[in-house]
Amino acid sequence: MVELPESLAGLPEPVAERVRVVASRRYPAAGTFVLHWMHTALRVEENPALDTARFLATRLNLPLLVYQGLSERYPYACDRHHAFILQGARETHRELAAAGIPSVFHLERPGHRGPHLRTLAGRAAAVVTEDFPTAPISDWLPRVAERAAGPVFAVDTACVVPMRLVGRAYDRAFSYRDATAAMRAARLARPWFTVARTQFASVAPVVANTAAPTASTSVSTPAPPPVPPSAPPSASPSAPPSAPPPAPPPSTAFDLPFEPLDWERIEEDRAGLARLIGDCDIDHTVGPIADTPGGSRAGYERWNAFRRSGLARYAYDRNDPLRAGTSRLSAYLRYGMVSPLRIAREAAAVMAAGGGGKAGAEKFLDELLVWRELAYTFCHYRRDHGTVAAIPGWAQRTLADHQADRRPALFDAESLARGCTGDPLWDAAQRSLRVRGELHNNVRMTWGKALVGWTPDLATAWRHLVDLNHQFALDGRDPSSYGGLLWCVGQFDRPFTPPQPVFGTVRTRPLKDHAMRLDPDQYREQVDRPAGGSAPRVAVIGAGVAGLIAARTLADSGFEVSVFEKSRGAGGRAATRRAEPKLAFDHGAQYFTAYDPRFRQAVETWIEQGLAARWPAPLVQIGPAGVAAKTDQPERFVFVPGMSAIGRHLAKDLSIRGDLRIARVESRPAGWELIDTAGQSQGQFDYAVVAVPSPQAADLLGDHPFAAEARAVPMTPCWAAMAAFERRVDTAWDGAFLHESPLAWVSRNSAKPGRDPSSDCWVLHATADWTAANLDLPKDEAARQLLAAFGHSVEQSAAAGQGGRCGASHSTPDGQAAPLPATIHLDAHRWMFSATPLTLDRQCLWDDASQLALCGDWLAGGRIEGAYRSGAAAAGCVLRKAGLATP
């Protein structure tokens, strides 16, 4: 056992045995407070890390500061995880204030970023935090320790048998159960002690820092008497002390390097929490869960209800999700909002009482204290737990031996995430993860095993297992999650013979067998049952990329969504015009780029599906100075076989009413009513998402304040000519940006990936100024003039040695020969709302009171990526409104 420093002498044994020394240093003379970094034990009751920090602050005669931060950069950061953590933090910091303990919360977002934890650690006399063995905490802790000025202690707050006492990782539950039996029994029989304020002195005032230790002296403050282990547990985590606690020092007393959240202000603003989450640069397409709010109160309410009515039957009902036989505590345990120590004690009391509840309590404790803590201990000692290296050698070998076996099917990441495999049981399970943020453990085992058979190799299966679980599950990224996922690929298990296809000797759990004991239709009905009785109705006006992303995100999240589109097709300016089978033109958006990591992830999935491809085209700039290669080229992508493919893809499975123009969106007491151009109502909806160009949005909204904001964002028109030639235009490039020309851009459409190269098809985009000056030209005349300008550009290119004459030529209106072959097709299309020189850079507009969202590329920097991000942001606003309960 690691010896603790003298400053922690007298720390009660139930706490002391949990402390791990991360960095052993002398206490710095300049340290002005003890810092408790709180992250995965969001509770005041039975919190060994908080108790250790309070004890140490008392010993050092220094104030205690509790710091909690929420980063935008943790893996799978999204509204769901952010909301759950913030809800729990709001309650915890309220209880800390009631206990007289100063606490601050830093929420990373634009204007509020920086390495503030490391800054505080560098000024603290000591740092105390929770010992949590999975990323990102396990990665961040060494960095914090490196920057800390004083010692750093990590305290196990998650396990009844502390991880550090187990000594090693176990790969079988029975081995772990036997090895820890004595330690577990001793701790279950020992009530948790009470941290009384008469024994842990109140926090010292900031100005009373007279006994701060120096670098060369030990702490001389006498230890407070330890609380006897047999002391009765606190009757209530928030019971008032015998004397009012002193007022905590203001946050300004700690010279904070950031502005902490003002919880009182957030409480006063009904939409404050949702707005803060919306400001964060995280995934807004995974929304909060309305019936699973964060916080100790909600967690213990769930536990008490289960203890009363479910615990006794747990052994019999736990494997059937239709019986609601589980505690559903995993998310609360994952973030330490409930104490596993208390849960275990109370379950053990039921078991000890005997009678009908004994079997259920005994099985529950086995899951809580053996399987769960087996996973925590495994992750603690196996730092490779997040990789396939953590899988037993026999499992790795047998899966490798069967890697070439024929798979029943292969699915891409998007189809899996959306639950679109065609297997009713698996799709219902994935929908439970996506919509409810949880998955019944017995179903999770079958769900996870299926991915082994649906992916080409172990590495891909593991990646999908981790991504799907951690993105959607509220209990994701914790040791229990890794334990369950590792079990799916052979860990904590033994070989099964004879070998099976794909799996080898890894245990199988066929979906068809599970469907015989769990009716997929009943399970899907349970998963889809709205928490409020009926699914919220959402109207999306506009089936461009922004509208489709918003609509599909909400439909996948359980909303009843109707899309209204004035055109016959979907996709907006991501459009493709076909003149005949071999002639196709992307006459709207030409290509797209991907800078945002979440959009980039979607693009990689589209590439995997064959829906998109990289376009490494040779591009040039043509102007008065000549022709120059475009050197500052980002990676460009196109949709396949045309840009309109994305509209068809996103529109699949959506209810779209096409060729229908909405004239007005009118506010009603219960939401919004849509009126078409014939004056007919198209229905009333709880939410409205307007996803059309800014001038059209302004017309739809009447006197709503957003109408003025939309009207302030102009959109420019664009003439687009489409030309096909009898022979190839002789250029060394496939696309060009033009300057001082009627044209802004030209591209060889037939050179894009997935296009028919047998015909030479070009798209010619006019400048906004030329289009505005020639807005009323007949389209045939606009096409002829733009073709002439193209010929002039090709002539410039030829003169610069970049290709040129192609044989036959045609005459321009001024009689000059143009170096172009004869056209076999020439047409034009006028885009009235093509682009905007000014965007609001707001992602979307949201009116919380009326439940109205505006989205579109005109709000988010333009282009397809901007439209995607704006649609996702609008969906996030609706998801947060529906998923965040009023405090």
Where is each model-derived feature located?
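Glycine/tryptophan-enriched, flexible segments
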Residues: 169-213, 244-380, 384-389, 522-525
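Trp/Phe/Arg-rich N-terminal binding region typifying the photolyase-homology
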Residues: 1-196, 208-213, 217, 224, ...
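Active-site-proximal binding-pocket segments
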Residues: 320-518
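A conserved short coil-to-beta-strand element within the FAD-binding core of flavoproteins
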Residues: 658-673
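Active-site substrate-recognition segment that forms the wall
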Residues: 722-775, 781, 785-794
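Central helical "cap/lid" subdomain
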Residues: 571, 580, 585, 681-737
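Glycine-rich FAD pyrophosphate-binding loop
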Residues: 555-580
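Flavin (FAD/FMN) cofactor-binding core of flavoprotein oxidoreductases
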Residues: 791-798, 814-850
